[in-house]
Regions:
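Solvent-exposed loop/turn segments connecting transmembrane beta-strands
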Residues: 40-50, 76-87, 114-121, 151-159
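Residue-level signature of outer-membrane beta-barrel architecture
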Residues: 56-58, 92-94, 132, 146, ...
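Cleavable N-terminal export/targeting peptides
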Residues: 1-28
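Short loop/turn motifs that connect adjacent beta-strands in outer-membrane beta-barrel proteins
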Residues: 20-30, 44-45, 60-70, 95-101, ...
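Outer-membrane beta-barrel "beta-signal"
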Residues: 48-54, 132, 157-170
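Helix-adjacent hinge/juxtasegments
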Residues: 81-105
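Mid-chain, well-packed structural core segment of small domains
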Residues: 99-126
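Transmembrane beta-strand segments that form the barrel wall of outer-membrane beta-barrel proteins
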Residues: 32-41, 67-79, 102-109, 144-148
Length: 170
């Protein structure tokens, strides 16, 4: 087989798998990463603790529903008392001009470390976040959340936390 025939055959085979520049620019590769810090269980004087955490959101997986634009989120936090929480769940986003309102619900796994005993390994985080667009690719926000085991354990004290958030889109 000569080289010319080989090139023609390879071109025909690979043509359906190629994309041109116009198609590539229409594909949105937007992902959001946020870091946050705040106060874990601020309403309990005996067990409140500072926290730091991160969260990832992939906009390519979002869905428009009757509840709004929903997308999956995954993240983790750790407190100064070595308590930790890893989670994954869903958030909705509502925009009013430069303001963003983002409620979320994320089940996860909690480890108390030297911090507050929340009564169970499985905890549910309900959160409301308000943020302001700083630029096309960044936001600054404030959020409040409640962590609870929904009475899965013998006790369910819950924890209320607030955080300051910085978001960066990539």
């Amino acid at each position: 087989m000569n080289l010319k025939k080989l090139i023609i055959i390879l071109t025909i085979i690979l043509m359906p798998f190629s994309s041109n520049a116009e198609e590539s620019t229409n594909i949105d590769q937007y992902t959001q990463f946020s870091v946050y810090t705040g106060m874990f269980d601020f309403s309990d004087d005996g067990k409140k603790s500072t926290l730091i955490g991160f969260q990832h959101q992939n906009e390519n997986l979002n869905r428009d529903t009757f509840l709004g634009n929903l997308s999956p989120v995954t993240g983790a936090l750790i407190t100064a008392d070595n308590a930790g929480y890893i989670y994954t769940g869903v958030q909705a986003q509502y925009k009013i001009g430069a303001l963003n309102f983002t409620p979320s619900f994320t089940p996860g796994l909690y480890h108390e470390g030297n911090g507050k005993d929340l009564g169970h390994l499985i905890e549910f985080k309900s959160e409301l976040q308000i943020s302001l667009d700083l630029s096309k690719n960044s936001e600054l926000g404030f959020s409040y959340n409640h962590l609870s085991n929904a009475s899965l354990g013998d006790k369910n004290p819950g924890a209320n936390s607030y955080m300051f958030n910085f978001f960066k889109n990539f």
